[in-house]
Amino acid sequence: MTIIYSPEFNSTSYINLEQRQGQLLGLKVCGSTELLSELELRTGIIALEQSEPERLVAFHESLSKNVKGTIFEESFKTDEVGVARQLMVWTDNLLMAGWTPDTKVDSDKLMVLAKIVKGVVGKHVAQRWQDLTTYLKSHTIFQKDDVIEVHTEELIPAVIKSTLEQLAHQATVNYVVHEGQIPTDFKVFHFKTRDNAYQWYLSQPDAINNVDVTISSDNCILNDMAIAMGKPTVNSKSQNSNPQLLQLFKLGLSLFARPLNVNHLLSYLLIPGNPVGGVSYKLAKVLAKEGGVNEEWQKVIDEFDFTETNEKGEKKDKRQERLQFLMMMKKDYYAEGILVSDIRTYTENLAHWCDKQLRSPFTDDERKEQLVVLASFCRSLLLILPADGNISSELLQNHVDGIYRPQTFTHMKAQKGAPDVVSSITQLVDKAEKVCWLGCIGDSSAVYPFDFLNTKEIEKLQQSGITIPSKSVFYSKQHQMLLESLKNVHQLVLVTWEFDSNARQEEHPLITELKHQHHDDWGKRVINDEKPNLPIKKGNIIKLDPQTTYQLSDKMTSLKRENESYSSITTMIQHPFDYAVNYLLKLHEPQIGQLPDLDTTKGLVAHRFVELLVKKYGEQMAEDYDRIPQEQKSNLMADAIQQKGAVLLLPEYKLECQQFKSILDDSVSVLADIIQKLQLKPLDSEVEMNVNLDVIGEFKAEVDLVLRNPKGEYVIFDFKWSEGKTYPNKLEENKSIQLELYKEALKLHYGAGSKIAGVAYYLFPKMTLFTVDFPESDHIHHIEQKEENGKRVLLDEINNSYVYRRNELNKGMIEESEMTEISEIAYTKADTADDPLFPLEPDYNHDTLKGCPYVKVDKPPFVKKDGWKKNPTTNEIQANPEVIKEIKTTHPILKGRLV
């Protein structure tokens, strides 16, 4: 039996079978953990392996009992779990160095740590090594011809050294010292980006032919690219990974805090396979649309069918089981903090859900790894939480952050034909003729583990027989280990890159050292941006330019919406292709993963605030507004924000929210004054009108505010959160399809004889009413239309244009004609005095051409801003394709073919 040991080795370390004459049987490569398990197995010593969260809980329990009156007391009050974790790391390093709680050292810090360690329930790994050493003094577990081959002796912790010394009495323990020097036969292949380097490597260039082993520390992206290129994958692990499943722990518990973090709620609902079940997607969709939790949220829950079929084929109602993971949404924790019992209930349910998933035959191995960790997080929190009472959101967050840690999970396994890959140069057990170091960047040295000790404490420990290396000695040993490992290599190929995801990478110390040693011929050894060894396919690229017309299938010609809206009518007239794709085929770009932007959110909140005011105060809203107590206003505004703009409650928007509330209060006060000045009474807000228009047919209008004057005539106000000129310009040019159709809808909604006194846009940020129907006054801007605009009968134009486009659709043809001279388009030529059509909008870059949607292009990496143009010339594009900032496209959903 031969055991090969180094703290740096693991089961995937490189062994040269030819050098060892094929003696794989009876050979075992071990790191410290594997060696401990092997020795305990041979001795029959049974030691319960504690997970990291379990060890943390035990340490926290001992610390909480012993922290009073110590130097750690105040910091422990601030962050119990975080401090416990840090002190646990310190004691781990001390214990492995040979320190014990009984070591006599005149240091307050070390005496406190000793007291804490004595109170920890469970056996530390250092104690397990010490127990082994004691056992080996009187027991033999190896035969004389067994060999233990030890590498990197300088890095072996003291407690393990003691065990190895004892093993030397019953087996052959050889300490390997590498002969030779670091390789002089090397090349450096330098690339701009990691992707370029990986593509070159996977293309199997001549430079890496006959490579014995590849060193690569992060193979996840490498494997993704290998799959894309049809190459076999290698063993890979997601290092320091935060998979979505583990986020259930952090995100779920963050939902108990108030104000509610709506971004966290959206992320929680979008985690695949989350415990909320199928309703989560629908809730995420309504949350993204509404901007907060309101009656639409509850409507989804009430109407959702929670019936599920179990493994036996039985159907069961899972409503209660699923909704228990949203129980915090119905609680208000503002006043007295969060009930510990609620936290416990949620955490216990989440742990129980993990257990059920682990028992399911449909759960794959990768997910099981994550479920085990998630369950351990939950149970650790349950042990740390108080038995009952309340807990603040800050303390809960500290507990969660202290317990949660990124993990390492299996990503992919090596496939047949994959190269031999190790994660570090220190994992070369034997000599290798040719090695490729893929990703020789940055400084991967271990962090000095004794930074918490001062010089005097180190000296006192050494006087007690415990060797603590100084920082300089520690890093010197690390560097020496690197050089020793390189002696195993004859020919070396180093692959480096300058950027990884736009982040500039540091130079590896080895590159720095080699550059210094070989400065005379360094230029000959470095190859920059080597082209990948890929076959070149030649062919004509067919560019899909915007078309003049499109043919529709027979099925599409019969498609018709249940009801139209002003936005669908506008799209049909201006961009019939978009209408067909968006409204008939219902193909939209996915937007469920994001909440509305800030300006849209403010508009939603403003609408809801006015709606709540009208609902509460009715016709007296305008007269009463300035007399409403500030507390009542604040409560109504808070409700509006919670229901429609919860993102404003996030800490990062605190100042923005304060400014917004002030502007909204002032703006609604101005709106109330305008209503009184015009002698109007609010009738209703957010009025849904489903009517049948003469030409268009079924039509749905959502009117922001309907008012009435003393004559009983109706007035429409439409609210906008905008500071631009778009809406005033629509009125000036007599192009407001929205207000024109709303007038017709209102007449039908309120019955025959209904008269319209006027319509207007109210822009909240500008605190101004824009109208053509009411006279100029404070905060009322009367817009004068040019004579030719005022003479146009807008409703006739809209109806005629609708009929024109509908006839096109019925015939199976769409005339898009984007970026075509407007005067040459058939639609324009059909515009006559007898049958006027609504005018087409020109492109914002070209006044005479019909408008076209644009796709915004992200600035490519490494392209300077001044070289990135919005409207480059044809010559500029041919010279440098990267200068394009926007691309014209028939429809945004087709942008995948363009960018």
What do the PLM-derived regions correspond to, one by one?
Residues K543-V899:
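RecB-family 4Fe-4S metal-dependent nuclease core
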Residues K144-I148, F304-S424, A606-S685:
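Accessory C-terminal helicase-associated subdomains
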Residues Y5-F9, G31-L35, I148-T152, D212-D218, ...:
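Conserved helicase core region in the C-terminal RecA-like lobe
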Residues T2-V29, Q143-P259, K431, L898:
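Conserved motor-region signature of P-loop NTPase helicases/translocases
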Residues T100-R194, D420-Q427, E433-W437, A606, ...:
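Conserved helicase NTPase motor core
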Residues I468-H518, K811, E816-D847:
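C-terminal accessory regions
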Residues F9-K144, E153-E154, A158, G278-Q324:
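Basic/charged alpha-beta structural segments of nucleotide/phosphate-handling enzymes
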Residues L17-K28, E38, T43-G44, P205-M329, ...:
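ATPase/helicase motor core of nucleic-acid motors
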